Amino acid sequence: MVAKILDGKQIAKDYRQGLQNQVEALKEKGFTPKLSVILVGNDGASQSYVRSKKKAAEKIGMISEIVHLEETATEEEVLNELNRLNNDDSVSGILVQVPLPKQVSEQKILEAINPDKDVDGFHPINIGKLYIDEQTFVPCTPLGIMEILKHADIDLEGKNAVVIGRSHIVGQPVSKLLLQKNASVTILHSRSKDMASYLKDADVIVSAVGKPGLVTKDVVKEGAVIIDVGNTPDENGKLKGDVDYDAVKEIAGAITPVPGGVGPLTITMVLNNTLLAEKMRRGVDS
């Protein structure tokens, strides 16, 4: 069998059209979602990613701004800018682009974001709400993964799902989302023993560790669904996933490519959460 290719670009395009329709409906009520992104320093990858978010937001009718601070900005300066955005009623959602310079505590900054504007879903309050099944902002990559699975009509109930990676950004939250869909979830990590035995029994594999070639054909069950979150540049700058794509697609039931799989959905869910933030604070039903 040859796997169905889960085209994240097309899924994202369709989803963004739905978001655009909702933004237009919200504007008719007098409300326009606004996304503000704080960028500290001149890291090329961060600048490119932030510009992509701004462009995507504006394309569906949102307002977006980049607040660019110098590489030498102090923690206090970043906190002051963040506090201004927290108190600005025109701002629906706030993102702080990471990594931050070494003189700025990432944790302190993320905890200073107003939880009601935390569209990355990284604030401890929002993480806690996710784990007690309250409505909240869910981290964008896990949310995008779930949309891919939904779009592909993957029934997760009772299925064995293996998540490789335990980060607070992807591994742990996507495990919780899979649990909410009644999957039986196993989390593997760098200290796990005999990973192959778990992978061979998995109906769904989500790999998010940034190790090219980690998931090989010999550990994948025929017909399994493979979600590859890895995006490690090789020596030529080409992005590589965690999965041996060419070999695994010959046996998997469905698979995401890299690039063009999960990535487009991550930015899409930033927009989704910004829209949700505006609706929640204006008392508009989702």
Curated annotation (Swiss-Prot):
* Binding site residues for NADP(+): 165-167, 190
Record's keyword annotation contains NADP? yes
Query: From the UniProt record, which GO molecular function terms apply?
Result: methenyltetrahydrofolate cyclohydrolase activity; methylenetetrahydrofolate dehydrogenase (NADP+) activity
Keywords, ordered alphabetically: Amino-acid biosynthesis, Histidine biosynthesis, Hydrolase, Methionine biosynthesis, Multifunctional enzyme, NADP, One-carbon metabolism, Oxidoreductase, Purine biosynthesis
The record's listing under InterPro entries reads: Aminoacid_DH-like_N_sf, NAD(P)-bd_dom_sf, THF_DH/CycHdrlase, THF_DH/CycHdrlase_cat_dom, THF_DH/CycHdrlase_NAD-bd_dom
| Chemical reaction(s) catalysed | (6R)-5,10-methylene-5,6,7,8-tetrahydrofolate + NADP(+) = (6R)-5,10-methenyltetrahydrofolate + NADPH; (6R)-5,10-methenyltetrahydrofolate + H2O = (6R)-10-formyltetrahydrofolate + H(+)
Q: In which pathway does it act?
A: One-carbon metabolism; tetrahydrofolate interconversion
Q: Which NCBIfam families match?
A: PRK14175.1
Regarding protein family, the annotation reads: Belongs to the tetrahydrofolate dehydrogenase/cyclohydrolase family.
**This protein's name:** Bifunctional protein FolD
Q: Which organism is it from?
A: Staphylococcus aureus (strain bovine RF122 / ET3-1)
Q: Highest lineage ranks of the organism?
A: Bacteria, Bacillati, Bacillota, Bacilli, Bacillales
Q: Which gene encodes it?
A: folD
